[in-house]
Amino acid sequence: MAMAEGERTECAEPPRDEPPADGALKRAEELKTQANDYFKAKDYENAIKFYSQAIELNPSNAIYYGNRSLAYLRTECYGYALGDATRAIELDKKYIKGYYRRAASNMALGKFRAALRDYETVVKVKPHDKDAKMKYQECNKIVKQKAFERAIAGDEHKRSVVDSLDIESMTIEDEYSGPKLEDGKVTISFMKELMQWYKDQKKLHRKCAYQILVQVKEVLSKLSTLVETTLKETEKITVCGDTHGQFYDLLNIFELNGLPSETNPYIFNGDFVDRGSFSVEVILTLFGFKLLYPDHFHLLRGNHETDNMNQIYGFEGEVKAKYTAQMYELFSEVFEWLPLAQCINGKVLIMHGGLFSEDGVTLDDIRKIERNRQPPDSGPMCDLLWSDPQPQNGRSISKRGVSCQFGPDVTKAFLEENNLDYIIRSHEVKAEGYEVAHGGRCVTVFSAPNYCDQMGNKASYIHLQGSDLRPQFHQFTAVPHPNVKPMAYANTLLQLGMM
């Protein structure tokens, strides 16, 4: 489902008819050793590069594919990881790590039944392996939970969580000394107090959290799927990319660029939650500002504002740990109302993922998307959340295993058809925090520095001025945060080293 930046490494080639010569075998092993060293140093792009070179010399070695599959997993190239794991198994049906890798890939893609089949294979081969048993049991639990959720979803009369809440009867205990909404309303003083409260690692009272969620659902549900914003010549707006639960880096954005206000508007381009372990703090801060400045603070949906992602990458677990399962269900409802795209002055289109698997999509098609749902596996809604640019023309299979990759010609044609200048998207880590591709027509912005405490990347945000709309990039680096590791609330399989 997600991806990494950098040069695209080609998918595995089919084995040659003739076995490689001894010299080629030796060189392939040397390349594998180099790749392993890069992998240990967390330089996954170079690891992929050298595993690929080893595969070119000896395409019949299952281990090379298994190793490259793991490197793809680490860079969130789940589609490529799945292909390599499957090839490894085809080459050697006894290669157990291949089944682990394929299960991990399918888990990341939300294909839990397929993952369960591979974990089942591992358990049969290694019946006394505690790790294998634990992963099988955890995956089986998810499969059963999903089946239960589908059964409930089949009830057309399913009620909103809001209908079962009695917020007025919730009492705020005398010993609670934290921020409270003023007459049920978010104010700037509340927001300042909230951010300091969160900075001190304290929890907002559940009544206040529910008040924010109920109110922001009402606000978001009235918005169009495509938000259209007009900037006057003297006005500017700040566009931020993924924040992924990195609350202390979010505070740093506001420190560097100023707090949101009617004269300092923001757009946050999805993926507010998951991975980082302060996702609750990030999202309630963002929702608070949305309530305070509904016309000047904009939130677009990312692929991680979805149930499948939240179940695996930590947000669901974090909400349940800090609050309740019921509150997570309400978050899920709210996420479904987040707009999918925003257009500035009719010239700059912003979305989380990218462009479309098919030609001919118009802005009016985006407006007509019924977004109040979990995203489908294909189609325009899926593409807006999931697709990625590629340097070559045309389209190709997604490295993530979802949606597609689109080339410069696709971008140019879409912009010309819709009378746009360029697109801004997020969704991918970039070493410098941003990237300008497709001849300036496709801009990526990523706002989570040192992503997951391990990527070492810079982050950035963009200023757009109404007078010319040219992107002005502002880079920043990570700031310290409390000793809570990323993925602390992620699915147990991840914590068990699924990837």
Curated annotation (Swiss-Prot):
Binding-site list for substrate: H244, R275, N303, H304, R400, H427
Chain positions covered by the region annotation Disordered: 1-23
GO biological-process terms attached to the record: cellular response to cadmium ion; cellular response to hydrogen peroxide; DNA-templated transcription; double-strand break repair; MAPK cascade; mitotic cell cycle; negative regulation of apoptotic process; negative regulation of MAPK cascade
Cofactor: Mg(2+); Mn(2+)
Post-translational modification remark: Activated by at least two different proteolytic cleavages producing a 56 kDa and a 50 kDa form.
Pfam families referenced in this protein's UniProt entry, alphabetically: Metallophos, PPP5, TPR_1
Positions contributing to Mn(2+) 2 binding: D271, N303, H352, H427
Region (Required for autoinhibition): 495-499
Enzyme Commission number(s) of this protein: 3.1.3.16
Swiss-Prot/TrEMBL catalytic activity: O-phospho-L-seryl-[protein] + H2O = L-seryl-[protein] + phosphate; O-phospho-L-threonyl-[protein] + H2O = L-threonyl-[protein] + phosphate
Record-listed Mn(2+) 1 binding positions: D242, H244, D271
Residue ranges of the region described as Catalytic: 184-499
UniProt key word Hydrolase: yes
Keywords, alphabetical: Acetylation, Alzheimer disease, Amyloid, Amyloidosis, Cell membrane, Cytoplasm, DNA damage, DNA repair, Hydrolase, Lipid-binding, Magnesium, Manganese, Membrane, Metal-binding, Neurodegeneration, Nucleus, Protein phosphatase, Repeat, TPR repeat
Cofactor binding note from Swiss-Prot or TrEMBL: Binds 2 Mg(2+) or Mn(2+) cations per subunit.
PROSITE patterns named in the record: SER_THR_PHOSPHATASE, TPR, TPR_REGION
UniProt effect for mutating K93E: Decreases interaction with RAC1 and translocation to the membrane in presence of active RAC1
Gene3D superfamilies: 3.60.21.10, Tetratricopeptide repeat domain
Subunit structure: Probably forms a complex composed of chaperones HSP90 and HSP70, co-chaperones STIP1/HOP, CDC37, PPP5C, PTGES3/p23, TSC1 and client protein TSC2. Probably forms a complex composed of chaperones HSP90 and HSP70, co-chaperones CDC37, PPP5C, TSC1 and client protein TSC2, CDK4, AKT, RAF1 and NR3C1; this complex does not contain co-chaperones STIP1/HOP and PTGES3/p23. Part of a complex with HSP90/HSP90AA1 and steroid receptors. Interacts (via TPR repeats) with HSP90AA1 (via TPR repeat-binding motif) or HSPA1A/HSPA1B; the interaction is direct and activates the phosphatase activity.
Functional description taken from the UniProt entry: Serine/threonine-protein phosphatase that dephosphorylates a myriad of proteins involved in different signaling pathways including the kinases CSNK1E, ASK1/MAP3K5, PRKDC and RAF1, the nuclear receptors NR3C1, PPARG, ESR1 and ESR2, SMAD proteins and TAU/MAPT. Implicated in wide ranging cellular processes, including apoptosis, differentiation, DNA damage response, cell survival, regulation of ion channels or circadian rhythms, in response to steroid and thyroid hormones, calcium, fatty acids, TGF-beta as well as oxidative and genotoxic stresses.
Protein name: Serine/threonine-protein phosphatase 5
Taxonomic source organism: Homo sapiens (Human)
Annotated gene: PPP5C
